[in-house]
Amino acid sequence: MKAEVIKLDASSAGSIELDDAIFGLEPRADILHRVVRWQRAKAQAGTHSVLGKSDVSYSTKKIYRQKGTGGARHGSKKAPIFRHGGVYKGPTPRSHAHDLNKKFRALGLKHALSSKATTGNLIVIEDIAMSEAKTALLAKAVKELGWKRVLVIDGADINENFAKAARNLEGIDVLPSIGANVYDILKRDTLVITKAGVEALEARLK
């Protein structure tokens, strides 16, 4: 498929041929869902922790004798039914990550790129080189281009001036091609890829 290439000043820079096997697939929500779920589970801290019966600070002494009191049978005050007692089967620190095949993850990235291309939310830009790291200059360019919530993917290395200028702009994320992932692509309304980024992604996903 063919895509128009623009410059940062919104002028035309010709066109580029995009690989249909990467940018021209029919997006499948089930594949995207599985990959996003894998990403978010992997990112989850899993530091949740509560005190169990063996962790709370109480004596293990039996609170009163077994028989003859007319009350229910009890052991120590660490039991979950008592105030300040331990929590029964509460959450403990653990990893929430689960396995997902490497080929399936690559397929998910292809479907994420295709979803932006098929909905007209993919923009190919010649490069994002800036002579100086000025947020005001980039903000003006972004306004003229009509970008609201965008993810910009560059080649192997991000242009340092652009990255610094974009740091203070709300709604703009910048990633190198190796950092391109399904969750960040779907999170933003528009995907902007440099020509170097397109080449790097096509080489990565061949």
UniProtKB/Swiss-Prot annotation:
Cysteines engaged in disulfide bonds, as pairs: none
GO MF annotation terms: rRNA binding; structural constituent of ribosome
A cellular-component GO term for this protein: ribosome
Family matches, as SUPFAM superfamilies: Ribosomal protein L4 (SSF52166)
Coiled coil location: none
Superkingdom of source: Bacteria
Biological process according to GO: translation
Protein role: One of the primary rRNA binding proteins, this protein initially binds near the 5'-end of the 23S rRNA. It is important during the early stages of 50S assembly. It makes multiple contacts with different domains of the 23S rRNA in the assembled 50S subunit and ribosome.
NCBIfam families: rplD_bact
Similarity section: Belongs to the universal ribosomal protein uL4 family.
PANTHER family named among the record's database cross-references: 50S RIBOSOMAL PROTEIN L4, LARGE RIBOSOMAL SUBUNIT PROTEIN UL4M
Protein's UniProt name: Large ribosomal subunit protein uL4
Gene coding for it: rplD
